[in-house]
């Protein structure tokens, strides 16, 4: 039974509807609950996902101890459980980047105002979200310094001073850092003022090379989400007015959350020569002629963790795909006070670690039921139950987190069979999420049909559009928030008329409400 909600005002974050009525996140109260449950089952203060999706999300983030609120409005503290997931994401992506010859760098946090103003479209796009440093100690600065919302201007300033010849190209760089954007409405992981991310920036000798890199990094993100996060998606180019500030083209990866809303999960941008020309980045080619460079940028942030939670989580907490789980398996001794149980459990721990598994043991004095519940909240993909009878029969019981299936495995085979089980979980989780996505994509050829579909169903709708932003605004108003997510360019259009105005359609697009 879910305990009643308590409405607790909190000054550390904005309080949109997403947070109103959330349960207390007090460590003291949470500790009391768990102390009371020591000899019973761990009390999970998690609202049902279907009852209140926003509250469910907040509860999971809290109960799994992924983050805590900061005393700075709109910012958050990444706790060990949450940061460990980010470290797994970092390690996987960093490997993928380096396989494409990306090099890591680190550029400053602060950007002079004059530098930010060199590219008008770029600064116009970020102006409402910029935070400024105006004083150094007690002295007012002669020029304001922007706390980076993104780093295109810093990279371009550096390259303008260091790139001279075609021999200096390409530059294919990435940095892992945090950025600050003064968001008005904040949600843990999904939208906070300061967040962690990676931002890749490249310059190339030719338009074709830069376009190729843009598409290549877009593909890296798609592979990452499919193979590591077990998250299916739709993907395509953004509409003209949805492109990143200053970009000629933006390619997006859009995942569908369990509540039917889309999440922009990663983007790759092609800038062409316009942005670097504003910074006078030129190089001398093989014919000794001065040429412009062509730029790209691409990024993925900690909102990927929010997407992971909302795609795979259930009413008992997190459900982590094995390839991104910081811990793949937790060993839980049963009747551990009995002779030999703990010794054999620790032997198994050592064996699995030696075999390369990310594995831990819970040998605390809490009851097995409490330990099972905690493992479920944390989303650890498997647990191994081992008790006196198991040892006597030379076996263990492996329990899958995703579907609760119990599998009896010989102790002689556990080091090999556990890998098979984990890979099966990874595959099953992707297939389940893909089936959900596929079953929540609809088609509409009239505005009335689209409005009714959004009233009765959750998901994405394919519909045709003339490309006019005013028409999109009218659709957004009529549907209560649905907007273009990306263009569909690899399928035949389902209509030759715009869903709103009836004029000739230029694009078929995915429409959806979003985070």
Residues covered by each model-derived region:
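NTP/phosphate- and nucleic-acid-binding module
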Residues: 27-515
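Short, often N-terminal, low-complexity regions
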Residues: 3-4
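Glycine- and charge-rich intrinsically disordered segments
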Residues: 24
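Short polybasic linear motifs
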Residues: 14
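Short hydrophobic alpha-helical segments enriched in small aliphatic residues
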Residues: 8-11, 20, 29
């Amino acid at each position: 039974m879910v305990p009643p909600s308590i409405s607790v005002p909190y000054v550390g974050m904005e309080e949109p509807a997403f947070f109103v009525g959330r349960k207390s996140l007090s460590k003291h109260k949470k500790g009391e609950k768990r102390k009371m449950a020591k000899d019973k089952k761990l009390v999970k203060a998690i609202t049902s996902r279907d009852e209140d999706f926003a509250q469910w999300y907040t509860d999971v983030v809290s109960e799994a101890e992924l983050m805590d609120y900061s005393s700075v409005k709109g910012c958050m503290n990444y706790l060990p459980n949450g940061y460990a997931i980010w470290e797994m994401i970092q390690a996987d992506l960093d490997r993928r980047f380096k396989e494409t010859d990306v090099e890591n760098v680190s550029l400053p946090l602060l950007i002079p105002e004059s530098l930010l103003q060199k590219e008008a479209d770029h600064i116009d796009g970020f102006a409402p979200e910029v935070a400024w440093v105006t004083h150094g100690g007690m002295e007012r600065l002669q020029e304001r310094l922007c706390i980076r919302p993104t780093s295109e201007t810093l990279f371009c300033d550096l390259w303008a001073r260091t790139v001279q010849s075609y021999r200096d190209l390409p530059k294919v760089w990435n940095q892992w850092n945090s950025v600050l954007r003064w968001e008005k409405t904040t949600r843990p992981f999904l939208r906070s003022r300061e967040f962690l991310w990676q931002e890749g920036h490249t310059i190339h000798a030719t338009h074709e090379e830069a376009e190729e890199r843009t598409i290549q990094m877009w593909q890296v993100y798609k592979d990452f989400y499919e193979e590591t996060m077990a998250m299916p998606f739709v993907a395509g180019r953004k509409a003209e007015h949805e492109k990143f500030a200053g970009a000629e083209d933006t390619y997006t990866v859009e995942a569908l959350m369990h509540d039917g809303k889309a999440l922009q999960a990663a983007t790759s941008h092609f800038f062409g020569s316009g942005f670097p020309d504003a910074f006078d980045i030129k190089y001398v080619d093989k014919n000794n002629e001065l040429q412009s460079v062509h730029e790209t940028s691409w990024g993925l942030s900690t909102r990927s963790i929010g997407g992971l939670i909302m795609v795979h989580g259930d009413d008992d907490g997190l459900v982590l795909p094995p390839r991104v789980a910081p811990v793949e398996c937790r060993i839980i001794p049963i009747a551990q006070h009995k002779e030999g149980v703990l010794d054999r459990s620790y032997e198994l721990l050592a064996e699995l670690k030696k075999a390369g598994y990310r594995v831990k043991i819970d040998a605390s004095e809490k009851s097995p039921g409490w330990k099972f519940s905690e493992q479920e909240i944390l989303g650890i993909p498997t647990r191994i139950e081992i008790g006196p009878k198991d040892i006597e029969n030379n076996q263990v019981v492996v329990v899958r987190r995703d579907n609760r299936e119990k599998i009896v495995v010989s102790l002689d085979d556990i080091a090999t069979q556990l890998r098979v089980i984990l890979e099966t979980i990874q595959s099953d989780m992707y297939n389940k999420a893909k089936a959900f996505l596929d079953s929540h994509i609809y088609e509409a050829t009239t505005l009335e049909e689209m409005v009714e579909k959004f009233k009765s169903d959750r998901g994405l709708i394919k519909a045709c559009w003339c490309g006019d932003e005013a028409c999109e605004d009218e659709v957004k108003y009529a549907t209560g928030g649905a907007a273009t997510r990306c263009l569909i360019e690899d399928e035949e259009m389902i209509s030759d008329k715009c869903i709103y105005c009836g004029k000739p359609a230029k694009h078929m697009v995915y429409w959806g409400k979003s985070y």
